[in-house]
Amino acid sequence: MNTTKSFSLLLLVFFCSLVSAQDKEMKTNSAKFIRDIYTEALTRGHAYEDLRFLCKEIGARITGSTEAQMAIEWGQEKMKSYGLETRLHEIQVPHWERGTKEAFYLKTSRGTHLKLRGLALGGSVGTNGTLRGNLIEFESLEALKEATPEMVKGKIVFVNQAMDAKQIQTFKAYGGCYPLRGNSASIAAEKGAIGSVIRSLGLASDPHPHTGSMYYTDGVDKIPAAAICTADADKIHGFFKNNPQQEIQLVMEMDCRSFPDATSYNVLGEIKGSKYSDEIITVGGHLDSWDTGEGAHDDGAGIIHCLEAFRILKEMNYQPQHTLRLVFFMNEENGNKGGKTYAKWVKENEEKHFAAIESDRGGFAPRGFTCDGSEEQVEWLNSLAPI
C-alpha cells in the first residue's frame, strides 16, 4: 500500500477511535466502518492527485510569496469542494527572499580552489557583494561558545557539528543540532566573526545542502549565515585535518534579504459536531514550505493526510458528535506565526479542544503517533489501543 494513503487510513482509524471510545453504538459497527474507510481510500482516493497539484502546480510556498497565497486559495477551495465549512484566519508572517545570487568557494594557501554547494539560511542577511574571510572550524556549537574573540575576530566561522547517528529517533538527532542552525551566527558575531557557515542538518553524506530557519539576537551585528552540504563539510574538515598550518579562505556571495511582515492566513475547515459542537478535535499540518523544493514531505504529505481523512469522512456521510476541525497552518518553517496566532485565538475565544493531531514527519510508511501531554492523558490515549 502506498504511504500517503496508508497514513491517511491510520489517521482516520485513530481519529474515529477518539469518538468511538464514547459511542457504544459506533463500537458495535466499528469493524464495518473501518473497512468502508479502507475501501473508499484504496479505490477512490484523491490523495496523490491533490499532493501532485500542491507540489507541481503551486510548488515551493515560503511565507510571504505568491505561491503561499496560491496554496491558501487552493486549500480553501479544496475544503469547500469536499463539503467542509471554511474560513480564513488572518496572521502576520515574515517575508524573506533568497534572491538570485548564491555562491560559495573555498581557497587554500596551497592553491586549492573548490566550489562548495550551499544555501543561505532562512532569515539571513545578504553579503552585500562578495564576502571573503579566513575560515576557522569548530567541531560543535559548544566549542564555538568556548572560543575567545581573538580566535574568531574578522573570520568566517564554520561549525561542523554532525547529527548523532546513534539516535534511533532521528528527530532527537535533529533536535540536538537545531540550536546550531538557529543560533551560531549571532554567537559568532558576538565574538567578531564576519560570516557563519554550518554543516547541513542531515545524517547522510551527500551533495544536497539543507536550508532552514536562523535567528539573530537583538543588539548583535547581523552577519551572513549559510549551510554547506554534508559532503563538502567533510571535504573542508579534511583540508583542516591534513594541513593544519595552511590558511583556508571562504568566499561567499548571497543577495537574500528580508522585507516587512506580510499578511497571510491559516485555512480552517470544519464538520460541526451533532452533540458536542463546542468541543473540538483539531487535525492539521503546515501549508508553507521552504523555497528550494516542492515541500512534498515537509509538509505537503501532512496536509494531504489530513485533507484526505476529512474528505473520506464526508464521502461516507459520517456525522461526528464532536466538531472536527481541519487546519492548514501557515509559517511553521520560519516563525510558527500560524500556530502561535491560532493558539492565542483559541485561548481568547475560550474554545475547548478535546484533542489535537498533527502530521509533520514526512510521507513515509506510518509507524504510529507521538504524544505530548500529562501522564494521565498519555495513559488515556494508550487505553484506546485495543479499539
Regions found by a protein language model. Name each.
Residues K32-F33, K107-S109, K115-P149, M214-A296, ...:
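Soluble metallo-hydrolase cores and metallopeptidase-like ectodomains found primarily
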